[in-house]
């Protein structure tokens, strides 16, 4: 058991929320001609709080399911450290504060933030027990933080520019090999709660094929900014080096289809995305 202060922190999944902030801020700096420190601050606070609120609502909704799984049974809600009313009040409060800070960036930024949270909490979360297609739905809020940062940096605030859309596309496709490998090596634990999130609902050849295929799609998407002249040859070389490494691990997983190989590909995916994002940010 732990304190309520720690419980509120765990409710936010603060480490994951900080990674989301990283994607948003890097995308903002990538797109903005003259990045402003004040906007970086607003985007960081707003992005963190909206993501934290989404995670908090998710844990309230999945309290009973989390209690069934080894990886989630020690969360604040299953342990009863926080009451439902406390968690909901906290989530609603940080939602309002988060939206305010995103509004300081732009109206479109706040709107996309609200849409992202709504999809995650009201559509993706209840859909997880019903169909593997939940992963497709969840990929949208998973990638929207990149779009939030990108549109904040645009010179035109009433539209979504092409490069912003490309950044979103990369992170959108990244969600699939990332989450499916997680679902592969946590298959038995997810099954306890009735979550069957692999493409074919089970660890089989079809699911392994889809993981490998979407890794190829991800690499193809990562090259698009070069093909459309947003970055130069140096960036392309770095992207190709990172991509060949990712494909190598994807091939090993495809060949052996073990939990160990799934974990290695999962870790490779985690490293791949920030490498690509930071490379695109340099515009070299």
Range-by-range predicted roles:
Residues 49-57, 118-126, 168-187, 219, ...:
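Transmembrane alpha-helical segments that form the membrane-embedded catalytic/substrate-channel core
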